[in-house]
Amino acid sequence: MLERIGGARRCFRLSQKPAHSNGTSPPTRTEPGLLTSTARTDPQVLGWLKRRLGRDRTARKLYGSIVTQARRPAFYAAWGVPDTPQGRFEMVVLHLALVVRRLTREGADGQRLARALNEHFIVDMDDTMREMTFGDLRVPREIKQVTAALLDRHKAYSEALAEPQASKLQEAITAQLHYLGDSGQFDMVGLADYMRRAASALDPVPGARLLDGNLDWPQPDGGTAS
């Protein structure tokens, strides 16, 4: 499945220079005309819609930050991750898993935002596949597999980060990246160390700042890149 994600060009293309800090993200799908005239004036409905739109905007902001960080050259040049659609996919999902892990600690609001962020990723993948002219019957099957891969990685990385042994995270990363090539080409120690530093950088971010879409990423080679 992942070997066939060759069209993740819009979000996963690795630029030769560091991406801009604001990142890029696809437009949100809108469904005009879904609300009846009564619903448009109902305070509860309007309140729900306002919260949903705000959450979607925040998810787009977070996703842009994730993609920007995942495109940093060090992952590919220094640590051996292939500079291919599949390699970039894995780096985006790795960072997505870190953010979702942190969001789920922020109660109901954080869990809803984590869900919106995952949905934003899936919509982006769906759009990308359709741009590749995948058939309408094929796209749902591919998206089902992408969703399963996403959830598997969320679980594997979260469980490994909870273990004190550094080897557990290295093993989890190896298990997810093995299909990209000979595991000997990857610097698993460097990747695992970065992932722990990234988790440590996200942990102290105040909940209000996080729920407003602000992330603090470490530089792959040290320092901090917001």
Each predicted region: which residue ranges?
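Short intrinsically disordered, low-complexity coil segments enriched in acidic
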Residues: 1-6, 110
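Surface/interface-facing alpha-helical segments and adjacent flexible terminal/loop regions used
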Residues: 35-226
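Residue-identity detector for glycine
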Residues: 6-7, 23, 33
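Leucine-biased recognition of intrinsically disordered, low-complexity hydrophobic segments
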Residues: 2, 14, 34-35
